[in-house]
Amino acid sequence: MKLKETLNLGKTAFPMRAGLPNKEPQWQAAWEQAELYKKRQELNAGKPAFHLHDGPPYANGNIHVGHALNKISKDIIVRSKSMSGFQAPYVPGWDTHGLPIEQVLAKQGIKRKEMDLAEYLEMCRQYALSQVDKQRDDFKRLGVSADWENPYVTLDPQFEADQIRVFGAMAEKGYIYRGAKPVYWSWSSESALAEAEIEYHDIDSTSLYYANKVKDGKGILDTNTYIVVWTTTPFTVTASRGLTVGPDMDYLVVKPAGSDRQYVVAEGLLDSLAGKFGWESFETLASHKGADLEYIVTEHPWDTDVEELVILGDHVTLESGTGIVHTAPGFGEDDYNVGTKYKLEVAVTVDERGLMTENAGPDFHGQFYNKVTPIVIDKLGDLLLAQEVINHSYPFDWRTKKPIIWRAVPQWFASVSDFRQDILDEIEKTTFHPSWGETRLYNMIRDRGDWVISRQRAWGVPLPIFYAEDGTAIMTKEVTDHVADLFQENGSIIWWQKEAKDLLPEGFTHPGSPNGEFTKETDIMDVWFDSGSSWNGVMNTKENLSYPADLYLEGSDQYRGWFNSSLITSVAVNGHAPYKAILSQGFVLDGKGEKMSKSKGNIISPNDVAKQYGADILRLWVASVDTDNDVRVSMEILGQVSETYRKIRNTLRFLIANTSDFNPATDTVAYADLGAVDKYMTIVFNQLVATITDAYERYDFMAIYKAVVNFVTVDLSAFYLDFAKDVVYIEAANSLERRRMQTVFYDILVKITKLLTPILPHTTEEIWSYLEHESEAFVQLAEMPVAETFSAQEDILEAWSAFMTLRTQAQKALEEARNAKIIGKSLEAHLTIYASEEVKTLLTALDSDIALLLIVSQLTIADLADAPADAVAFEGIAFMVEHAIGEVCERSRRIDPTTRMRSYNAFVCDHSAKIIEENFPEAVAEGFEESDK
């Protein structure tokens, strides 16, 4: 027998190398085979509910790292709730209608207008479902636990029917109307867009300063006066029908030197404008308030059939331009709102494809709208005072990445103004994480216009509206309920397969159709109405779910998207928000803080991460970042996270190995019988349990990450385990000292495995498979630990905090001795502590082997007054380090004066000899194999 065989060296097959890319799919297959999701739901049946509603990602292409951040975050929350005694199902969803799928088919050469519509829509449906399958596999590879076999998809007939019911309820309350207001118009998509479908980019535009000649000055201005206006969209001059001034702003009539014309500009902008126009000097002829100029008539710059009226508007500012805004009601929301008050013509001179129409004039007809600036300049002639290129933020279609325009076209709207205050009141009742989200959503709702819900596309849910012979729109409850029932049975495809009369209730009549003829709407709904009514199609209808949901969690862009649309529809129909709380997250950027794009080559694919590092590394990264703000990720950052993971894994491996002979049923030592340092570690660990429990409640994953890393590296590796191994290795296997520490080891191991399961489910499942004494087959079926408190806890923590200060001081003294070549390793040291009475009292109160805790072979405690001059001194304490006396025990590796060769061929100290002689009689009788001595 070898001497080292008398040591209790930890044994485990749990590997140091994780091998996550290969092992994770095996665990996922095992979970699926065991129906773990279903079993967890059955375990929690009847318990308090927690329902997170999944915002549906768009079903197109593989998932990106933003999807991963979102789904992993949701999974962490739902798993933690499920293991904490909540009935917490997770129904994933997909958004499956909309333009991107039409664009994919177009790229494949499929031409919608050249084929049967029903056939085209079926191709869209099949493509969408194929993308759902692709993304489902991607999400499952991340270890996300969900009801994957029963997701919700917005193309499902039941969902479409429930969406129609939401529309019908809003229509019944009068919240749906048709209007010709300007809307965001995407010429590249040939459709109206909602605010949530807009993104902004900085572009260069040519801005023009030009003048309208006064035609009727109303006794205030003479006819040789010109009113100066500014535009950044020259094409809209073709539809200009008014000039808007600020009613309380001051305007001057000035005559530049050498000019026979006089001009009107805002007083606050005159100096800057004079420089632009080359007016070296000018004479001020008069001053007027904007309100004085109301109803003055001017000539259109070139269209002699058009007069432009001076009107008043509160949106005019002195921030730029001339203080006078040319007003084209067909091309802007402010222009429309102020123009309709004065009954200005709503002229629209651009068609759905972005081409100038016939009523723009023969010089413009057929030209692309943003190519006509040279024509406008030519038509203005000497009325053009200046032009300049400006860089400004401009709206783009978020799908096609092309600029858009405001354009007045007949559209269907959902009113927001009718119940805006109700929505704002509901926002104030909602909990927001982070808290600034409340202000953001509140301001968006407060400032937004009505919601344009119609789209001039094919792939989507039809607007369930019929028209009588006299043009009256029909959307009564009877009609929408009937359409909803048809959609539920057949899917929305029936809208395109049947004539209007066959879609209406049997025997339906309307006074506007004396001949019984009806037509149907051909526009579809905005896809934000699809997902925005999911509270009804999912939370309000699916078994084991509830409405309102406890939580919506999405990226911060959803304040103007899903959070917004869901809130509007829910308040409109039921008077309350669809959620109790909102958690928003920042965007995922690359390692340099830049947006990811294919062109930059900086995209991080979750699938690539899973193949290289494993999904648990990506999950740990999610827990490591502050998602309240934008977060960064790169392969280098993931490499750093992987290193942290390795430290956690190897520490837990140590605990597994050193509890391999521990049976909690027979070997556990009661808290009252633990050693002082073991009690201290038990208290510290339970504080960690409390911290993690609270952080899960607050959805603060980063707090969990920091707390776990600190506990593993500082409290365990750098302190407790550093000296505990000298006990668990050296003391007799069944000794009280060893079982005390194993009790703490096992308690930490089991509980931290449970606590980490929501974040690292694959790793903790692997650990759990080595814990043969635990009853649950899978850790996911276990319950979260509950933090305990202990008598005199604060006093114990205070005493050990003081010891930690002493320990740091002792380590400095040992380091100085090491540098002076007095010792090599700390176990070569004889440490003398010269202590004040206060420190002596502390050391006595700790009731511990201080030499063991400081990892020195010998320790002496003396009076502070006896400290030599060359001692390493601190306030109330000093240290002297000398080389320990004696020989190194081959078993304990400590220097001990009792170390000597024993009759059984072991060069050991008296303490090790006693353990050997009591526990290994055969080895004592036969002698050990050859010693080094």
Curated annotation (Swiss-Prot):
E.C. designation(s): 6.1.1.5
InterPro entries tied to this protein: aa-tRNA-synth_I_CS, aa-tRNA-synth_Ia, Anticodon_Ile_BEm, Ile-tRNA-ligase, Ile-tRNA-ligase_type1, Ile-tRNA_ligase, M/V/L/I-tRNA-synth_anticd-bd, Rossmann-like_a/b/a_fold
CDD domains: Anticodon_Ia_Ile_BEm, IleRS_core
Any single GO CC term annotated in Swiss-Prot or TrEMBL for this entry: cytosol
Placement of sequence motif 'HIGH' region: 57-67
Protein's GO biological process: isoleucyl-tRNA aminoacylation
Binding sites annotated in the UniProt record for L-isoleucyl-5'-AMP: E554
Superkingdom of the organism of origin: Bacteria
Family annotation (SUPFAM superfamilies): Anticodon-binding domain of a subclass of class I aminoacyl-tRNA synthetases, Nucleotidylyl transferase, ValRS/IleRS/LeuRS editing domain
Enzyme class: ligase
Main location: cytoplasm
Gene3D superfamilies for this protein: 1.10.730.20, HUPs, Ile-tRNA synthetase CP2 domain-like
UniProt KW Transmembrane keyword: no
Keywords: Aminoacyl-tRNA synthetase, ATP-binding, Cytoplasm, Ligase, Nucleotide-binding, Protein biosynthesis
Residues annotated to bind ATP: K598
Catalyses which reaction(s): tRNA(Ile) + L-isoleucine + ATP = L-isoleucyl-tRNA(Ile) + AMP + diphosphate
Keyword Cytoplasm: yes
Cell location: Cytoplasm
Pfam families attached to this UniProt entry: Anticodon_1, tRNA-synt_1
Record-level Gene Ontology MF annotations: aminoacyl-tRNA deacylase activity; ATP binding; isoleucine-tRNA ligase activity; tRNA binding
Motif 'KMSKS' region: positions: 595-599
Subunit structure: Monomer.
Domain text: IleRS has two distinct active sites: one for aminoacylation and one for editing. The misactivated valine is translocated from the active site to the editing site, which sterically excludes the correctly activated isoleucine. The single editing site contains two valyl binding pockets, one specific for each substrate (Val-AMP or Val-tRNA(Ile)).
Family indicated by similarity: Belongs to the class-I aminoacyl-tRNA synthetase family. IleS type 1 subfamily.
HAMAP family the UniProt entry points to: Ile_tRNA_synth_type1
Name of the protein: Isoleucine--tRNA ligase
